[in-house]
Amino acid sequence: MRKIIHIDMDCYFAAVEMRDFPELRGKPIAVGGRSDRRGVISTCSYEARKFGVRSAMSSYHALQLCPQLILVPGRMEVYKSVSLQIREIFHRYTDLVEPLSLDEAYLDVTDCDAHQGSATLIAKTIRDEIFEVTGLTASAGIAPIKFLAKIASDLNKPNGQYVITPNQIADFVKDLPLSKIPGVGKVTSKKLADIGLTTCYDVQQYPKVQLIEAFGKFGHVLAERAQGIDSRQISPHRVRKSVGVETTLAKDIFTLEQCHQVLPQLIQELSTRVRRSAKDRQIHKQVVKLKFNDFKQTTIEHRSDEISINLFHELLLQALQRSQGRGIRLVGVSVGLADVTLASSESSVDQITQLDLQF
């Protein structure tokens, strides 16, 4: 088994703002767009979270929950710069670093000799160095596998860490709610609960064949996670699986004609991003996303090996038919990407060892 650390910065964007503007410290703040421009919260301070403010919430709703909330515009270039400082610290201990976003990453420290190979002490040292260099706190999860390390990093926040050793895995996952497993969202949780599955122990007792019948490939993944199995390796150079662009509209729109007016600029920007960041990848599907004024969303996708304007218009029509009279506040378009060899092969078909590791 490996020694995996998941580092997660504490309310990262908000923490950077409070560091740079001390007058914000101790106050409920959120980084996000203005409520009169239909902004959305990126992240918020712990003081704001006490009022129920959360990421991805509309700024308008956040201000209803917390009238004294201070909205701060994001400074993405600053966040990127600080993130690079943090990654430099990671690479002092291992080259096996898999960034998930600006504020979190997996590290494989199995072969790191620091602190006699203790992943627990390595994680603590990394967190201390992050604070020394950036003035920001980070939390960490330490485990032999990725998904448990990620779960563990959330168990002693803020500015803490949690360790799951190899011999603790079985007991830990037994009572673990399925909703804690990365990839199990509200919709999947409800589907699982409808068939009596709420914990990993429930899944352990459930026939794997039926799980796969109900959830497809994810059923197989879920069965493994419920047993404490995750064979994924750290990927220092993560392969991009999709490229997309979306826009939040100044006012709700309701008609197909209004939606069509939004598409050209989105498709142009998407094409630019694909050329810039996915030169060696092959398009294998197109996706349209609509978010309605009740914040529920829908996506429609179809196989395609190129960006087709006509197909985007067809997918938009199908997505709009799900609106049920609701206004549309966001429109997005994206493409799925695959290796050139994988994409070409798809198109030809119809459309617990080493338990003595120091933790």
Curated annotation (Swiss-Prot):
Its main location: cytoplasm. GO terms for biological process: DNA-templated DNA replication; error-prone translesion synthesis; SOS response. Disulfide bonds: none annotated. The record marks 13 as: Substrate discrimination. Mg(2+) binds at residues 8, 103. This is DNA polymerase IV. Keywords: Cytoplasm, DNA damage, DNA repair, DNA replication, DNA-binding, DNA-directed DNA polymerase, Magnesium, Metal-binding, Mutator protein, Nucleotidyltransferase, Transferase. Belongs to the DNA polymerase type-Y family. InterPro entries: DNA/RNA_pol_sf, DNA_pol_Y-fam_lit_finger_sf, DNA_pol_Y-fam_little_finger, DNA_polymerase-Y, DNApol_IV, IMS_HHH_1, Rev_trsase/Diguanyl_cyclase, UmuC. It comes from Shewanella frigidimarina (strain NCIMB 400). The lineage of its organism: Bacteria, Pseudomonadati, Pseudomonadota, Gammaproteobacteria, Alteromonadales.
